[in-house]
C-alpha cells in the first residue's frame, strides 16, 4: 500500500476509483494491462489520500444530480477498504448530497455498507453490479482466489433483492477451454433469475488479452491448468479478442434463458438504466434524469 495525492476524482462520466491495484488475484484481470500505465506493482495498492475531500468538492459543485459510479478499474471492496473505509465515506457523501450510486464488485464485503446502500436507494437510486464467471466453486477458487466465491456473491445478490436494491450481473469473462460450457452459462443465469437481477451484461463468450495481462494470465494457466496455455497459443496466437469455439451456441442459450426469465440482456439498455438518475419524492414517485 502507498498513498498519492490525486488531482481529481470523478471522470467525465462521473466514475471514480478510490484505489488503484487489487489483491483479489483474478487470473484474467484486464486492469493489469500495460495500457493503463500503472507504475507500481499491481498488488501494491495505490490509495488516493485526498479522494474524499475531492469527492465532496466535486459533488458540491455539480449543478445537476446524477449517478456516481465506482469499481470499473479496481474492485472497491478489497481487504484494505475494511481498514481505511474510503468507500463508506464516499457513500455517506453521495447520500448527504442526494446523488445516486452504482458499484461493481465481486466481494461480499459490500454488505458492511448495506445500511447506506438502502438509504441511498430510498432517497434516489442505488444499483449493485456483481461479476459472476462460474457456478463451479472449485473453479472459482482457482481463477478468483482471494475474493468471495460465486456462492457467496449469490447470497449477496439475494440479500440485496430482499432489501429492494436492484442488481446487475456481469457475465464475464468466459474463458475458452475452462468455463465456456452450457452448464456454466445456464447455472449462472439460474442464479440471476433467483436473485431477480435486473439485467445481465455480456459482451460475448470469450475474453480479451493485452500486453501485461496476457503474460500474467498465461503464467497462471501454466500453474493451474497445464497444457491449456498451449491451446490458447495454437488457437488464438496474439489476438486481442479470444472468442470461445462455443460462442454462437452459448450466446443463443444466453439470450434464450434471459428471455425466459425476464432478465434484461441488451447491454445498451442496461447501461442507460445504470446512468439514469432517479429522485424519489415524498410520495414515492420517481423523477428520471438522463
Q: What are these model-predicted stretches?
A:
Residues 84-85, 118-130, 179-196, 221-224:
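Short, electropositive alpha-helical surface patch
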Amino acid at each position: 500500500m502507498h498513498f498519492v495525492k490525486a488531482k481529481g476524482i470523478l471522470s467525465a462520466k462521473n466514475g471514480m476509483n478510490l484505489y488503484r491495484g487489487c489483491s483479489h488475484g483474478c487470473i484474467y484481470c484486464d486492469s493489469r494491462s500495460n495500457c493503463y500505465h500503472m507504475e507500481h506493482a499491481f498488488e501494491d495498492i495505490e490509495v488516493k489520500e485526498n479522494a474524499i475531500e475531492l469527492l465532496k468538492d466535486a459533488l458540491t459543485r455539480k449543478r445537476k444530480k446524477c449517478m456516481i459510479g465506482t469499481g470499473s478499474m479496481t474492485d472497491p471492496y478489497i481487504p484494505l477498504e475494511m481498514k481505511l473505509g474510503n468507500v463508506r465515506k464516499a457513500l455517506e457523501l453521495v447520500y448527504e448530497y442526494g446523488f445516486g450510486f452504482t458499484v461493481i464488485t465481486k466481494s461480499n464485503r459490500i454488505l458492511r455498507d448495506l445500511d447506506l446502500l438502502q438509504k441511498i436507494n430510498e432517497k434516489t437510486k442505488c444499483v449493485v453490479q456483481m461479476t459472476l464467471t462460474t457456478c463451479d466453486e472449485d473453479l472459482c477458487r482457482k481463477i478468483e482466489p482471494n475474493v468471495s466465491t460465486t456462492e457467496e456473491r449469490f447470497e449477496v445478490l439475494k440479500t440485496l433483492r430482499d432489501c429492494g436494491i436492484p442488481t446487475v450481473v456481469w457475465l464475464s469473462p468466459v474463458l475458452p477451454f475452462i468455463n465456456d460450457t452450457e452448464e456454466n452459462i445456464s447455472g449462472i443465469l439460474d442464479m440471476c433469475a433467483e436473485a431477480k437481477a435486473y439485467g445481465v451484461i455480456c459482451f460475448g463468450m470469450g475474453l480479451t488479452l493485452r500486453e501485461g495481462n496476457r503474460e500474467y494470465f498465461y503464467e497462471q494457466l501454466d500453474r493451474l491448468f497445464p497444457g491449456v496455455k498451449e491451446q490458447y497459443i495454437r488457437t488464438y496466437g496474439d489476438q486481442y479478442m479470444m472468442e470461445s469455439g462455443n460462442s454462437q451456441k452459448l450466446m443463443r442459450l444466453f439470450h434464450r434463458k434471459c428471455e425466459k426469465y425476464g432478465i434484461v440482456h441488451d447491454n445498451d439498455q442496461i447501461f442507460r438504466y445504470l446512468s439514469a438518475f432517479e429522485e424519489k419524492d415524498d410520495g414515492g414517485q420517481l423523477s428520471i434524469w438522463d
